Amino acid sequence: MAMYKVDPPVVPINQPTSTTCWYACLQMLFIWKKKDPSKIIPLMDQSPDLFPYYMLENGIAPSECKPTAKALGLGYAGDGDTYPDVLTNALKSHGPYWVAGMWKKNHSHVIVVTGCNPDLGTITYINPWCNFDLSESKADVDWLNARGDVWKQTLGSMMYWI
């Protein structure tokens, strides 16, 4: 089987500050679903468990992922490893995935997974940090799964449309 990519393609967005990768990636999901991304912060602000204006300045914590997904009407997963065939089927069923992790020591980050080749175990993703040419990157599922124990134990560290 060849690389499966979500359709329509995700429109890449650059994050404006070092703490807003989570927000830029949510915006990409909203735009992909043809929903108004300006509603993200107001919807989150309605939750007693979230402080989105603080989060814009400080990033998203693992404990804020599940409440964020719930506030925005997103599905959530992420506690454990994923597998190429499972990820491919998830992309086919739900579209792009918001994924939080710590791929560099002491630097949590969020990306949007846009494609997967189940035979090769490779993915395509959008990294919103300093992505000046607004391109997709490539990696393998093992890289995706090496996102740090804290994030891999966080239900909600992967979000998607239901």
Give names to the regions the model predicted.
Residues K5-V6, M44-I162:
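Conserved active-site-adjacent core of cysteine acyl-enzyme catalytic domains
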Residues M1-P52:
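Active-site nucleophile-adjacent alpha helix/oxyanion-hole segment immediately C-terminal to the catalytic cysteine
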